[in-house]
Design a protein with these regions (language model features):
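Acidic, glycine/proline-rich low-complexity segments that act as flexible tails and inter-domain linkers
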Residues: 1-12, 40, 64-88
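N-terminal alpha-helical segment
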Residues: 13-15, 31, 48
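Short, structured motif recognition centered on aromatic/hydrophobic residues
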Residues: 14-22, 52
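Short alpha-helix boundary/capping elements
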Residues: 21-27, 59-60
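Extended intrinsically disordered, low-complexity coil regions enriched in Ser, Thr, Gly, Ala
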Residues: 29-46, 66-72
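Short acidic/histidine-centered micro-motifs embedded in hydrophobic/aromatic stretches
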Residues: 51-55, 70-71
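Substrate/cofactor-recognition hotspot
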Residues: 54, 61-65
Length: 88
């Protein structure tokens, strides 16, 4: 199988990879969709936060802020929230 059917990488890891790539590319609509799926695949809020921090390092703070905004909307819709721990 190709893509999601490939058993070489588990679904959680693949979700994390997708979030990093989509965030780096600035594809926020797709990022939001995959953020929801990532939760179903076992990715935690802390792991999503860590992915966003890496996006900030390699792609810039403005792009990381876009990802935080998208994540906050996804989590708000699910009645959860995510915060940048560095700001607390």
């Amino acid at each position: 199988g190709f893509g999601w059917g490939d058993k070489c990488i588990n679904r959680k890891t693949r979700s994390m990879m997708n979030l990093a790539m989509l965030g780096a590319l600035g594809k926020m609509e797709e990022w939001s969709i995959h953020c929801k799926g990532a939760q179903r695949n076992g990715v935690t809020k802390d792991e999503i936060r860590a992915i966003i921090h890496v996006i900030g390092i390699y792609c810039g703070v403005p792009q990381a802020l876009e990802c935080f905004r998208a994540a906050n909307k996804v989590f708000a819709d699910a009645d959860l929230s995510i915060k940048n721990k560095n700001k607390d």
